[in-house]
């Protein structure tokens, strides 16, 4: 959990927190494992998630390192520059008995690659990933914070992989995947024995690969205000329906609708109602 710091404002964000808040908003009981600094920024983040009713039980406070932030320069809209500040508090998430207990009784653990950029949080993450629960990897590749070895270890631990087109291209270079998307997803799934792979395709919707079958959705045409957090909303919608044992077709439809809905707002975690999602699906 962190702050996206723009020249004129700071917005609470970070992909894991966005996904967690959407899942909480959809009615699931979510606990986020993270760490904030003992500072004003950290306290403001706690106040922010409190509005969503999400538990703070597994959020640690660091007395040495500051709350996480990403410095964003968006003067050139075609070439937005950002710096993921390091080191920060969430690089130093410590393993404890509470995390051990909670990670064994949940329905699913959702994780990304950035949580593994520092040794301390990386060790904690891989202990969590030893838990016998569904593990969903939102890979969220951000150079220079990953290596081929780290990717191997993360992918090996995942049951479900969520990626976008750019990330598939990067993985194709690492693992010599076919150029065609369907073939690349098939080989990737075979390499790591995934339960399924989910890929977002921007304005072209999304697709799911499972057991030799690919299911595609064209997405929903909406008037876009802000795509920040749209992919996170998509993943939350996917997880929500997947854990509810819905069909993959219905799961993908709901996920695309929620991603499209969030793109019609400013910010990654807007307030919305169930009927807002249904109105998108009825288009």
List PLM regions with ranges.
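Active-site metal-binding loops of divalent metal-dependent hydrolases
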Residues: 1, 15, 114, 139, ...
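Active-site flanking residues adjacent to catalytic metal/cofactor-binding acidic residues
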Residues: 3, 34, 137-139, 163, ...
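Hydrophobic residues at beta-strand termini and immediately following loops
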Residues: 33, 84, 217
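A short, structured active-site edge motif that brings together acidic residues
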Residues: 58-67
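Conserved phosphate-binding/catalytic region of the ribokinase-like
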Residues: 179-283
